[in-house]
Swiss-Prot record:
Subunit: Binds to the N-terminal domain of the chaperone ClpA.
Residue intervals passing through the bilayer: none
Similarity field: Belongs to the ClpS family.
Protein name: ATP-dependent Clp protease adapter protein ClpS
Task of the protein: Involved in the modulation of the specificity of the ClpAP-mediated ATP-dependent protein degradation.
UniProt xrefs under Pfam families: ClpS
NCBIfam families in UniProt: PRK00033.1-3, PRK00033.1-5
SUPFAM superfamilies: ClpS-like
GO biological process: protein catabolic process; proteolysis
Organism phylogeny: Bacteria, Pseudomonadati, Pseudomonadota, Gammaproteobacteria, Alteromonadales
Protein species of origin: Shewanella piezotolerans (strain WP3 / JCM 13877)
């Protein structure tokens, strides 16, 4: 086998072994105490939603009990959940952010 054929074989092996990472939904859960404006602020600050998108998600959270903020690989989703929960506690709100497999 020539050097070129060997390199091509290795490239094909690597490409066939790679797979997409598992994706996770980052979810905000409704509660009776967190103000709607604070939920909108969270969505804009941590998930880069514009005001219209943030309002739509906030209303889904309010009416359905939870809303999806975004779908990310596990590491990113886990970080966002931790950041949101920490920010909510710092601002004395019981808002709960969680993740589930997409």
């Amino acid at each position: 086998m020539s050097r070129t054929e060997n390199i091509e074989h290795v490239e094909e092996s690597v490409e066939s072994e790679l797979k997409q990472p598992s994706m996770y939904k980052v979810i905000l859960n409704n509660d009776d105490y967190t103000p709607m404006d604070f939920v909108i602020e969270i969505l804009q600050l941590f998930f880069r939603k514009d005001e219209a998108q943030a309002t739509e998600i906030m209303l889904a959270i309010h009416h359905k009990g939870k809303g999806i903020c975004g779908i990310y690989p596990f590491g990113i989703a886990e970080t966002k959940v931790a950041q949101v929960n920490q920010f909510a506690r710092q601002n004395e709100h019981p808002l709960l952010c969680s993740l589930e497999e997409a």
